């Protein structure tokens, strides 16, 4: 697809299903094309270790790999100028339609989406307020956000960037007692739903009871694909989503979805304006359009086929590991975050003289390098989610080799 067609599609019609629909091979089955690699091998030139990702969409491991159609969109759209606000308007409208939201925007990651969404709640579309963030004292803005104690994570700093104070609660009664004239909103951690004592539906009921906006962080809650619209349908006032990870858009991009009022306020607090808390959270036109195309294509994928592929990879690895005496495996799916088929490999240390931590180091130090996780006394965990086609066979063989070498 040419760059003019992409830009034209935002004005007149969605990107053609004939081009981005199921007539193409499922990208989950093909992975990024090896032909996209440049002639200049910068990883080798700079001495940077690359590896097979057997762990998942971890930011310090550079997240996920963008599909070819995202890379092509980024390249094609880099050759034209456009007005950034107009682009956010048009792309936001399309994303809102796809996600069942009133409004949406592309942000510089899910963390940025949380900060801008919080800013949108606090300031609305009042520039005077936006200019004061994060200095809330004496500003006339509300300053407290209620959140469950079990949802206390480092990434909540995205909210603190706006100057708010987090008020931690454990029960519905705690929420009732915590609400006061300073309360700005109630925030929920999507990946922490299992640990929390208040579920999303009840959290929303409490927010409605106290006439407060409710937000949710679902950065790691895809798949299932339905979560892209589920929390908007539930009634959360803003939803923050990672653009990398499962969707495999730009790793540095994210999506903020929510009510028209909150997204309008978030836009006021975002670039290209320079008087606000979000000025440093730039996202360029190529990332915005790459994110749009990535989301559209992700919604069109055959996710049942994708799931079966992951299960097949797990079976390949399990079969190889279990061929070594003293090894057992357990396949499972994490209940919320990173909700994909995963395998835990455990062994009898009386028969196999290696610890889990030692196994991880050997896999990492080998060629090709493999990054798994877990460790400990006698087990490791492997996720085939981010492997390229065929890499599961390499991982399976390497694990079998290392376990066999360590056998008594």
Positions of predicted regions on the chain:
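N-terminal secretory signal peptides
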Residues: 1-2
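N-terminal export signals
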Residues: 5-28
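Conserved PLP-enzyme active-site core in the AAT-like
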Residues: 7-10, 14-15, 34-52, 56-61, ...
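Conserved C-terminal alpha-helix-loop-beta "cap" of PLP-dependent enzymes
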Residues: 42, 320-398
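A glycine-/small-polar-enriched, mobile loop at the entrance of the PLP active site in fold-type I
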Residues: 52-90
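Flexible, glycine/charged-enriched surface loops at secondary-structure junctions
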Residues: 84-89, 103-104, 278-281, 301-310, ...
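A common structural junction motif
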Residues: 273-274, 364-370, 401-406
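Structural signature of PLP-dependent enzymes
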Residues: 295-319
């Amino acid at each position: 697809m040419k760059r003019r067609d992409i830009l034209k599609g935002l004005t007149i019609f969605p990107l053609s299903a004939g081009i981005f629909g199921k007539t193409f091979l499922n990208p989950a089955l093909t992975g990024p094309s090896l032909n996209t690699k440049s002639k200049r091998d910068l990883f080798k030139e700079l001495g940077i270790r690359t590896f097979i990702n057997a762990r998942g969409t971890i930011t310090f491991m550079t997240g996920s790999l963008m599909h070819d159609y995202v890379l092509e969109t980024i390249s094609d759209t880099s050759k034209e100028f456009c007005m950034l606000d107009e682009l956010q308007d048009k792309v936001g409208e399309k994303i809102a339609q796809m996600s069942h939201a009133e409004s949406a925007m592309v942000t510089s990651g899910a963390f940025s989406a949380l900060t801008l969404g919080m800013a949108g709640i606090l300031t609305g579309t009042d520039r005077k307020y936006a200019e004061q963030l994060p200095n809330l004292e004496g500003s006339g803005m509300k300053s407290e956000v209620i959140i469950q104690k079990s949802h206390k994570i480092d990434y909540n700093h995205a909210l603190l960037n706006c100057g708010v104070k987090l008020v931690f609660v454990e029960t519905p009664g705690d929420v009732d007692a915590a609400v006061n004239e300073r309360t700005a909103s109630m925030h929920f951690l999507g990946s922490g739903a299992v640990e929390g004592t208040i579920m999303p539906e009840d959290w929303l009921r409490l927010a409605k009871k106290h006439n407060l906006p409710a937000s949710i962080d679902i950065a790691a809650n895809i798949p299932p694909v339905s979560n892209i619209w589920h929390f908007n349908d539930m009634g959360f006032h803003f939803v923050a989503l990672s653009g990398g990870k499962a969707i495999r858009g730009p790793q540095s991009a994210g999506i903020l979805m929510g009510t028209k009022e909150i997204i309008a306020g978030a836009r006021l607090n975002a670039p290209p304006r320079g008087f606000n808390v979000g000025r440093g959270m730039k996202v360029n036109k190529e990332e915005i359009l790459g994110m749009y195309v990535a989301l559209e294509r992700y919604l069109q994928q055959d996710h049942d086929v994708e799931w079966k592929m992951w299960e097949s990879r797990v079976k390949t690895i399990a079969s190889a590991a279990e061929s070594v005496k003293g090894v057992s495996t357990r396949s499972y799916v994490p209940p919320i975050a990173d909700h994909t088929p995963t395998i835990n490999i455990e062994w009898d240390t009386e028969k196999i003289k290696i610890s889990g931590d030692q196994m991880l180091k050997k896999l990492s130090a080998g060629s090709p390098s493999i990054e798994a996780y877990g460790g400990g006394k006698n087990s490791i965990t492997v996720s085939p989610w981010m492997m390229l086609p065929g890499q599961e066979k390499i991982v399976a063989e390497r694990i079998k080799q290392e376990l066999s070498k360590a056998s008594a």
